[in-house]
Amino acid sequence: MKKYILITVILINAVVFAQKGPKIEFKDKDNTIDYGTVNKDDDSGLRTFEFTNTGDEPLIITNVQSTCGCTVPSKPTEPIAPGKTGKIDVKYNMHTGPIRKTITVESNAVNVEEGRVAIKIKGEVIEKPVVNLLEKKKTSPMMQ
Protein backbone atom coordinates (compact mmCIF):
# COMPACT_ATOMS: atom_id res chain seq x y z
CA MET A 1 0.00 0.00 0.00
CA LYS A 2 2.87 2.39 0.80
CA LYS A 3 4.29 1.80 -2.69
CA TYR A 4 1.03 2.88 -4.32
CA ILE A 5 0.87 6.04 -2.23
CA LEU A 6 4.49 6.87 -3.04
CA ILE A 7 3.96 6.31 -6.78
CA THR A 8 0.80 8.44 -6.69
CA VAL A 9 2.62 11.29 -4.92
CA ILE A 10 5.50 11.14 -7.43
CA LEU A 11 3.12 11.25 -10.41
CA ILE A 12 1.16 14.16 -8.96
CA ASN A 13 4.39 16.09 -8.33
CA ALA A 14 5.59 15.40 -11.87
CA VAL A 15 2.37 16.81 -13.30
CA VAL A 16 2.24 19.80 -10.94
CA PHE A 17 5.87 20.82 -11.40
CA ALA A 18 6.09 20.27 -15.16
CA GLN A 19 6.96 23.62 -16.73
CA LYS A 20 4.21 24.91 -18.93
CA GLY A 21 4.63 28.08 -20.87
CA PRO A 22 7.03 29.58 -23.39
CA LYS A 23 10.64 28.38 -23.49
CA ILE A 24 13.57 29.98 -25.32
CA GLU A 25 16.39 27.93 -26.88
CA PHE A 26 19.17 29.62 -28.87
CA LYS A 27 20.74 27.96 -31.91
CA ASP A 28 24.31 29.11 -31.24
CA LYS A 29 26.58 27.08 -28.96
CA ASP A 30 26.81 28.71 -25.52
CA ASN A 31 24.52 31.49 -26.84
CA THR A 32 27.64 33.05 -28.41
CA ILE A 33 28.45 34.28 -31.91
CA ASP A 34 32.15 34.40 -32.72
CA TYR A 35 33.02 37.09 -35.27
CA GLY A 36 36.51 35.65 -35.56
CA THR A 37 39.12 38.12 -36.82
CA VAL A 38 37.51 40.65 -39.15
CA ASN A 39 38.77 43.68 -41.06
CA LYS A 40 37.21 46.91 -39.83
CA ASP A 41 36.28 48.17 -43.30
CA ASP A 42 35.10 44.83 -44.71
CA ASP A 43 32.44 43.90 -42.15
CA SER A 44 29.21 45.68 -41.24
CA GLY A 45 29.22 44.24 -37.71
CA LEU A 46 25.69 42.83 -38.09
CA ARG A 47 25.02 39.33 -36.74
CA THR A 48 21.78 37.44 -36.05
CA PHE A 49 20.94 35.20 -33.12
CA GLU A 50 18.25 32.63 -33.94
CA PHE A 51 16.11 31.09 -31.22
CA THR A 52 13.16 28.73 -31.02
CA ASN A 53 10.15 28.76 -28.72
CA THR A 54 10.21 25.16 -27.47
CA GLY A 55 7.36 25.78 -25.04
CA ASP A 56 3.61 25.50 -25.40
CA GLU A 57 2.63 29.19 -25.21
CA PRO A 58 3.66 32.29 -27.21
CA LEU A 59 7.10 33.68 -26.32
CA ILE A 60 7.29 37.44 -25.86
CA ILE A 61 10.67 39.18 -25.94
CA THR A 62 10.11 42.24 -23.75
CA ASN A 63 13.57 43.79 -23.85
CA VAL A 64 17.10 43.32 -25.22
CA GLN A 65 19.86 45.40 -23.67
CA SER A 66 23.58 45.63 -24.36
CA THR A 67 26.39 46.25 -21.90
CA CYS A 68 27.50 49.31 -23.93
CA GLY A 69 26.41 51.71 -26.65
CA CYS A 70 28.77 50.16 -29.20
CA THR A 71 26.44 47.15 -29.53
CA VAL A 72 22.87 47.78 -30.71
CA PRO A 73 20.43 44.84 -30.47
CA SER A 74 16.94 44.71 -31.96
CA LYS A 75 14.14 42.41 -30.81
CA PRO A 76 11.13 40.85 -32.52
CA THR A 77 8.00 42.97 -32.25
CA GLU A 78 5.53 40.07 -32.41
CA PRO A 79 5.17 37.06 -30.07
CA ILE A 80 6.89 33.86 -31.24
CA ALA A 81 4.42 30.97 -31.47
CA PRO A 82 5.29 27.56 -29.99
CA GLY A 83 7.64 25.66 -32.32
CA LYS A 84 8.51 28.77 -34.33
CA THR A 85 11.82 30.60 -34.58
CA GLY A 86 12.66 34.24 -34.00
CA LYS A 87 15.68 36.47 -34.51
CA ILE A 88 17.58 39.05 -32.52
CA ASP A 89 19.84 41.22 -34.68
CA VAL A 90 22.99 42.64 -33.10
CA LYS A 91 24.96 45.47 -34.74
CA TYR A 92 28.45 46.03 -33.37
CA ASN A 93 30.29 49.31 -34.04
CA MET A 94 33.46 48.01 -35.65
CA HIS A 95 36.10 49.59 -33.38
CA THR A 96 39.59 48.13 -33.71
CA GLY A 97 40.37 45.69 -30.90
CA PRO A 98 38.84 42.71 -29.14
CA ILE A 99 35.07 42.15 -29.06
CA ARG A 100 33.62 40.87 -25.78
CA LYS A 101 30.03 42.02 -25.34
CA THR A 102 26.97 40.65 -23.56
CA ILE A 103 23.35 41.29 -24.47
CA THR A 104 20.61 40.51 -21.94
CA VAL A 105 17.36 39.15 -23.39
CA GLU A 106 14.27 39.54 -21.20
CA SER A 107 11.17 37.49 -21.96
CA ASN A 108 8.30 35.51 -20.48
CA ALA A 109 10.27 32.25 -20.90
CA VAL A 110 9.86 29.81 -18.01
CA ASN A 111 13.03 27.80 -18.66
CA VAL A 112 15.48 30.59 -17.75
CA GLU A 113 15.83 32.35 -14.41
CA GLU A 114 13.51 35.36 -14.18
CA GLY A 115 12.94 35.14 -17.95
CA ARG A 116 16.46 36.47 -18.61
CA VAL A 117 19.17 34.94 -20.75
CA ALA A 118 22.56 36.35 -21.77
CA ILE A 119 23.78 36.16 -25.35
CA LYS A 120 27.33 37.12 -26.28
CA ILE A 121 29.49 38.24 -29.16
CA LYS A 122 33.23 37.84 -29.33
CA GLY A 123 36.04 38.27 -31.82
CA GLU A 124 38.62 40.80 -32.91
CA VAL A 125 38.46 43.76 -35.27
CA ILE A 126 41.67 44.67 -37.09
CA GLU A 127 42.68 47.43 -39.48
CA LYS A 128 43.01 46.41 -43.08
CA PRO A 129 46.73 45.95 -43.82
CA VAL A 130 48.22 48.80 -45.86
CA VAL A 131 50.14 47.66 -48.91
CA ASN A 132 53.23 49.72 -49.65
CA LEU A 133 53.43 49.81 -53.44
CA LEU A 134 57.02 51.11 -53.40
CA GLU A 135 58.19 48.10 -51.40
CA LYS A 136 56.29 45.81 -53.73
CA LYS A 137 57.96 47.44 -56.72
CA LYS A 138 61.47 46.94 -55.29
CA THR A 139 60.92 43.23 -54.73
CA SER A 140 59.15 42.61 -58.01
CA PRO A 141 60.81 39.94 -60.20
CA MET A 142 60.55 42.30 -63.18
CA MET A 143 62.84 44.84 -61.47
CA GLN A 144 65.77 42.41 -61.23
Residue ranges, per PLM feature:
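Extracellular/lumenal ectodomain signal focusing on beta-strand-rich modules
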Residues: 37, 61-63, 102
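Surface-exposed binding patches on compact interaction domains or structured appendages
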Residues: 56-85
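Short, solvent-exposed loop/turn segments enriched in Ser/Thr/Gly
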Residues: 42-48, 95-102
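Asparagine-centered strand-capping/turn motif at beta-strand->loop junctions
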Residues: 51-55
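Short, hydrophobic beta-strand segments
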Residues: 88-95
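Beta-sheet-dominated interaction scaffolds and their linkers
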Residues: 19-48, 128-144
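Terminal connector regions
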Residues: 98-131
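Sec-dependent N-terminal signal peptides
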Residues: 4-13, 18
